Amino acid sequence: MVRGARQSQQPRSRLAPRLSGTVEKPPRKRKSRTEFTLKETMSSGGAEDDIPQGERKTVTDFCYLLDKSKQLFNGLRDLPQYGQKQWQSYFGRTFDVYTKLWKFQQQHRQVLDNRYGLKRWQIGEIASKIGQLYYHYYLRTSETSYLNEAFSFYSAIRQRSYYSQVNKEDRPELVVKKLRYYARFIVVCLLLNKMDVVKDLVKELSDEIEDYTHRFNTEDQVEWNLVLQEVAAFIEADPVMVLNDDNTIVITSNRLAETGAPLLEQGMIVGQLSLADALIIGNCNNQVKFSELTVDMFRMLQALEREPMNLASQMNKPGIQEPADKPTRRENPHKYLLYKPTFSQLYTFLAASFKELPANSVLLIYLSATGVFPTGRSDGEGPYDFGGVLTNSNRDIINGDAIHKRNQSHKEMHCLHPGDLYPFTRKPLFIVVDSSNSVAYKNFTNLFGQPLVCLLSPTAYPKALQDQSQRGSLFTLFLNNPLMAFLFVSGLSSMRRGLWEKCQEYLRKINRDIAQLLTHSRSIDQAFLQFFGDEFLRLLLTRFVFCSATMRMHKAFRETRNYPESYPQLPRDETVENPHLQKHILELASILDVRNIFFENSMDDY
């Protein structure tokens, strides 16, 4: 993840950046353990000459592999964060060394125990680094299968209690390693929707933090407590609980399943473009986040991924499997996660994605950010006259008055204006803007004739829903989990599993019908159909129509700014205000016994 927030002046935990999977800065270089391991052995176990040559070589080889693995792992942080080719060979070498190291310590455990003094927490460190490698590889490739591999190694550390003896040693830096392991494990579990494991880990982490701060006079207690608060808020962000008959919570997955996207009708002619790259940008003030991943970013991330499959056959017996250099088929679009990026950071990653975009492919830009509104008056209506969304600033505004006066005649610098995206419309571009100033992107101009669609959130919500904004945007929730969003606007906070599954089945029917409305429309802009061949984009489009139709029928959504918009505009009478779709929404409301909060005949009420 890109961490533009490092320059942010908002108070935040210094520990949080290390939770995103980014490689930590290595400590000051020390002499190799190889140089003095045998001398230590002599002093504790007899003369050096008494050590068999084979065992001496085993320790030497292990120390070499350990030092080499650390060197390669620390080098990961120097790799460019953008681009998809520069880093693959380095990752291959790193995986190769860790494969040898892991197998070597398994095969020679007794010798290493006796001659090297190998401790269980050191084995845990190796396993933790391997888990981090798989997590890094997931961030680089967006292949969710590698998350399962990271989970495999992190689980083994916990199940085998590799870190259990750390608390008995008077070394706070070892305890911090253990705490960071927990934090990374929680991130992986969140991404895999293993919420039951997350809750157990949070409890264990809380106990570990309490013990750590009690035993050592530390200065980071507040920061670790902030980590706990962040993850607690994150796992409670969903506004609706699905319950089993015994009142246990059902964990729902929002990744694309095999039958998730509505199928195209036989013979239907749509574009053959495929989603290849996505920039997911989060810069909302005060939104719940964990490990530099806001709730909105998390939800959009999952909306652009397929259900993961295991790479290894045995999850509880971790064995390293090196990622293939050339996967036969990319399951998921490649993604960059940018948390509070500066304008230059955002533009750098955008340019890298644009440069490497394959032929017949689409670049998606998702913006979840605070709106920036134009200051002063403007005689024109150009792409820099409507404001945009906020980008992060590198420094404090020292002279606020001077900045304010300058802004009366100049455009806001720390803002992504619609005009900033014009150069990238030379290739197919799909934009989703979730912001209080999303309408700034409504007046796009398609200069180059390439497919271009913008899905724009409402700029305001009814007062009853405004207090929930910290838990994520309603618009993004509709794109990620439309049924949960529908339940939320209907005032429902929990539901039995059986009813949930019944509603999901009906919603799949609604999505199929929406797909037909779009493909059968005679007046729809062809840009929408150009993107319709891709499963991810097709699902986003049908969910957008469902979201817009629901809000237009809901009695609480009465202002124009409460409705989503798009560029190009959709033909309302054939899509979001289609009587057939409105009937479906009323039927869904009837199943949930909330029909009274929707207009029976919305067309007559406008």
Curated annotation (Swiss-Prot):
Interacts with DIAPH1. Forms a nuclear ternary complex with MRTFA and SRF. The gene is Scai. GO terms for biological process: DNA-templated transcription; negative regulation of cell migration; negative regulation of Rho protein signal transduction. GO terms for molecular function: transcription corepressor activity. The keyword ATP-binding does not apply. Tumor suppressor which functions to suppress MRTFA-induced SRF transcriptional activity. May function in the RHOA-DIAPH1 signal transduction pathway and regulate cell migration through transcriptional regulation of ITGB1. Expressed in most tissues tested with higher expression levels in brain, spleen and thymus. InterPro entries: SCAI, SCAI_metazoan/Viridiplantae. This is Protein SCAI. Coiled coil: none annotated. Residues 1-212 are annotated as: Necessary to inhibit MRTFA-induced SRF transcriptional activity. Residues 1-53 are annotated as: Disordered. The modification Phosphotyrosine is found at residue 64. The keyword Transferase does not apply. It is a single-pass membrane protein. Belongs to the SCAI family. Pfam families: SCAI (PF12070). The chain crosses the membrane at residues 472-492. Residues 1-12 have a biased composition (Polar residues). Keywords: Cytoplasm, Membrane, Nucleus, Phosphoprotein, Repressor, Signal transduction inhibitor, Transcription, Transcription regulation, Transmembrane, Transmembrane helix. Residues 71-173 are annotated as: Required for interaction with MRTFA. It is found in: Membrane; Nucleus; Cytoplasm. It comes from Mus musculus (Mouse). GO terms for cellular component: cytoplasm; nuclear membrane; nucleoplasm; nucleus.
